[in-house]
Amino acid sequence: MPASCLLASLLPSTPLRLLAAQADAPDCSASTNQAGVLHGLTTDLAALNRQRLSTAACEFETAELARGYTVALGKLADFPGGQHHLPGPKAMRSGSGRLRLDGALLMALATWVTAAAAAVPLVETASGRVAGTQTQDVAVFRGLPYAAPPVGALRWRAPQPVTPWANNRGASKPGDACPQKRGLSLEGGGDPGTLNEDCLNLNVFTPRAEPGARLPVMVWLHGGALIFGSGGLPLYDGAPLASQGVVVVTLNYRLGPLGFFVHPAIEREAPGDGVNFGLLDQIAALQWVRRNIDAFGGDPGNVTLFGQSAGAQSVLALMTSPLSRDLMQRAVVQSAYGIPARPRGMARDTGVRVATAVGLPGADASAAQLRAVPAEQLAALEGNDLSLALGFIVGDPVVPVLPVEAFRAGRQARIPLLIGSNSDETSVALAFGIQPARLIKKLGIGGVLLRPLYRDVKEDAELGRQVVRDVVFTAFARRIAVLHAVKAPVWRYYYDRVPDGLCGKHLGVPHGGEVAPVFGTADLCACTGVIPTDGDRAAARAMTARWVEFARSGQPNIAGLPVWPADTKRKNVLLEFGDTQVVRSAFMRRRLDTFIAAGNLLGP
C-alpha cells in the first residue's frame, strides 16, 4: 500500500483547518481496506474510494503550527476529498503570504501533527500554553510555575504573579526543588534533585486534559518538618492516583529559613505582612488551581487538600487561616503532629541568631545583607543548633493563632475531614529529639500512672515509644476530630499494615508509611526497600479507592468495603487499616482521653 494512502486513513483526526482546492488525483481504493485493518477499523473504507477525488490543499498561518497544533478542528467531510489521500502539486507560497501544501505533503504533515499531538498534550493556562507528556492513561505537566521566582528582592516576600509567556512552555521535566540540607532530604524522603531558590512550581496529573471534564481535584502538600522535601519526588508521582479519575496536583513551597523567617530588618520593610512564606506559597498554589485547573479537566469547586506530616500540619493551618479557608472543599490530614508552633517573638530571636551564624551583625543586619546570603548557606544551618521550622510562626496574618486553638473556637473551614496516623510514628519523633522522659515530665505523671494504660508493654523503651506515638500523633488526631465533628463530618483512621516483605522486621508502620499506598507508588519508588507483593498492591488499591471516593463525594465509603462510620466525641470510632479494614470503637479510649486531658501538651 502506498504510504500516502496509509496517511490518508489517519487524516480525519488531524487538528488543522482545511480548505478545499480541486486537482486530479489517482485512485487509492485498492489499498484502503489494508489501511483499515492496520488501524483496527472495521468499516469498508474501499467504498469511499470508488471515484477519483480532487486535491485537498491546506491553507493556514505558519505561526499557528509553531504554537503547537492547536488550530481549530476542521470537519473534513465538508469538502471534496477530505477523507482521502490526494496527491497534487508541490507546496508553494500563496500570494497572501500563507503556505499552500499539496495533498501528499499535507497528509504527511497531518499524520506527524496527529502523532505529536497525542504525545504532547497542550493546555492553555492563564499565563500561557504548556506542553506536557502523555502516558497511557494520564497527561502529565511538570514544573509549572505558580508564582514568580522568590529571589533577590522577592526573598522573604509574599509570592508574586508569574510573568506570562508567549510560546509553548515545556512541562515534561520536574522543576527544581527548594533549597534544603540535602542530608536531611536523603534520610527523610528521597533525593529532591536540583536545588534552586527559583522553586515555586507544581505538577499536574490528569486523566482528561480538557476543559469541562469537572473531575475532582486533589492537591498534595509534602512532608519534611517544613525544612526538607519536594512535591516532585517519585513517591508523590500522581499518575497512578490520577488514573482513578481525579486530577492530582503536587507542589513545592519554601522551606526552612527561606520559608519561615522573622528578622527585624525584614519586618521593618513590610510591617504586618505574613512571615510564614511557605504557607503563603501553598495559598498561591491553591489560587493557581482555582484559576487554571478547569483547563486540565479539574473542577475548581471540588478541591481536596491533603498532606502528610508537615504537609498535614499545613492542611490544618490553611483550614484555619483567614486567607485560605475558602480555597478547599475537603481535607485529608495524614500524621499531623501535636508539637507547639513558635510565637513570633521566639521566631524573631531565631532570625537574629541566623544572621549572626552567617557572619552578619545579628539584629543590626540589613535586609539587603540578609538577601545577599546564598540560599545554600542558609539551608546548611538546619540541623545545627538552630531549630528553624519544625512549627509555624504564630502571630501573622496567615497563622494568627495556633490551628488547634482556631479549631477550638470553631474558626476552621466547615468541610469534610479525613484524619489519622500510623502505628509506629515514633520512628520520626525520636529522630527530631522528642524524648519519652521529657514528655512524661511535661504530662506531670510518672511511669506508675502510665503502666495501666499500656498493660501489654513490658519494656521501658517500648513504653516510651508508644507513649510518644500516642501523645504526639494518635491523641492529636483524635483531638482535632472531636473539635471538628461539631462543625462538619470527620472520618478517622489508624494505619497498621506493614508491607509483606517487612513483616517481623518492624514494630509497626513508620511515619510516612501510608503515603505510597495512598498514591499507589510502591512500584515506582524504593520507598519501602522491598518489592510489593500482590497483597500489598491489593491493600493499597483499597486505600486509594477510599481517598478518591472522599475527594469525589466528600465521604470515604465504597460498596464492597466495610462501612467507615464518621467519628464523634461520643462514638470514638475509626477504621483500622491492617491486613483487612476493621472498624474500631473506643479505640485507645483511656490513653487518648488521658493525654488530651493533659491540656497544654498539644498546644502552645
Predicted segment positions?
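Non-catalytic accessory segments of hydrolases
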Residues: 117-276, 300, 526-543, 552-563, ...
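Alpha/beta-hydrolase active-site loop
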Residues: 272-294
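C-terminal subdomain of alpha/beta-hydrolase-fold enzymes, centered on the catalytic histidine
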Residues: 316, 394-604
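Alpha/beta-hydrolase fold nucleophile elbow
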Residues: 297-308
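Substrate-access "cap/lid" subdomains that shape
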Residues: 188, 284-287, 291, 317, ...
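Hydrophobic helix segments
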Residues: 12, 28, 35, 41-45, ...
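Bacterial N-terminal signal peptides
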Residues: 103-114
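Glycine-rich nucleophile elbow surrounding the catalytic serine of serine-hydrolase chemistry
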Residues: 308-317
